[in-house]
């Protein structure tokens, strides 16, 4: 019987492999997955036996983003802000892990899933990986780490168009450290993490703190707080205010698949 936990953890030779485990939903992030991932991250951070971490996804994708299957409901602006602030805190906890964290990305890596990968220290992607942040097409956006990993023009191009890009394109932008053949991301990430696990732990932590301090001096953490508030404001607007009434009608009448097709059609290249 398959393990039903939304997050699986295996530790071998000092390397913890953390697997997002909702393959039937392309590992889309729901409340249960977020909570379990956060709990596991805290456990790993306190473990002396773990010297490096690999984050991956079960099945055909790393993570397709936030789980949209249940709709967003009609939450208040305050509730949305609290939710987004909690997500930001969880991303920062992953970023602040004392151990090096390597993301092993295959298949879809979109929206919140893309951000999850980019908050890791190093991203290894297989050639079939696809990255993107399509939320802009819904009248929203994600408070992103992308502007700290590439130049502002490229960040705006990706975030404004909502386009999906290949692993090779992501590497050219500085979002991915290494592209490996299809099916090879997890193996390559585990090999890299195995090498990192041999580092003196104090030295590895010092490097992480140093690079993190540079990003903080560039405003990363403060911008996440501002971005979370701005994203929550956008999410709290009505369909009429966002100008997406027709898309909402399509979703209500025809379902999520039809909604996504109608949303993305004007952006086809």
Please give the residue ranges for each predicted region.
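C-terminal alpha-helix plus adjacent terminal tail
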Residues: 1-13, 166-167, 187, 198-269
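Conserved CoA-thioester-binding segment of acyl-CoA-metabolizing enzymes
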Residues: 1-58
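A short, glycine- and basic residue-enriched loop/turn
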Residues: 23-26, 60, 65, 128-130, ...
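Glycine- (often His-adjacent) and acidic-residue-rich active-site loop
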Residues: 49, 57-93, 109, 249-255
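Charged catalytic carboxylate motif
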Residues: 32-36, 86, 93, 188, ...
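Crotonase-fold acyl-CoA enzyme core
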Residues: 92-204
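Terminal peptide-recognition signature
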Residues: 18, 22, 36-37, 55, ...
């Amino acid at each position: 019987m398959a393990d039903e936990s939304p997050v699986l953890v295996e530790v071998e030779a000092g390397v913890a492999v953390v697997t997002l485990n909702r393959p039937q939903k392309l590992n889309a992030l729901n409340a249960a997955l977020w909570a379990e991932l956060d709990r596991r991250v805290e456990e790993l951070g306190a473990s002396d036996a773990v010297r490096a971490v690999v984050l991956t996804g079960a099945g055909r994708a790393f993570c397709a983003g936030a789980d949209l299957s249940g709709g967003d409901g009609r939450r208040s602006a305050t509730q949305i802000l609290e939710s987004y602030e909690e997500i930001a805190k969880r991303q920062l906890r992953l970023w602040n892990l004392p151990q090096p964290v390597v993301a092993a990305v295959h298949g879809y890596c979109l929206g919140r899933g893309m951000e999850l990968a980019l908050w890791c220290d190093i991203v290894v992607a297989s050639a079939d990986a696809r990255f993107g942040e399509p939320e802009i097409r819904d009248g929203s956006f994600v408070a992103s780490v992308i502007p700290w990993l590439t130049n502002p023009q490229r960040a705006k191009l990706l975030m404004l168009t909502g386009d999906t890009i290949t692993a090779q394109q992501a590497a050219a932008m500085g979002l991915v450290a290494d592209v490996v053949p299809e099916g090879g991301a997890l193996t390559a990430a585990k090999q890299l993490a195995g090498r990192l696990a041999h580092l003196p732990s104090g030295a590895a932590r010092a490097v992480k703190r140093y690079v993190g301090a540079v990003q903080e001096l560039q405003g990363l953490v403060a911008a996440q707080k501002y971005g979370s508030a701005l994203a929550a404001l956008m999410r709290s607007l009505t369909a009429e205010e966002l100008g997406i009434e027709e898309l909402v009608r399509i979703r209500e009448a025809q379902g999520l698949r039809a909604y996504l097709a109608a949303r993305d059609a004007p952006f086809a290249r």
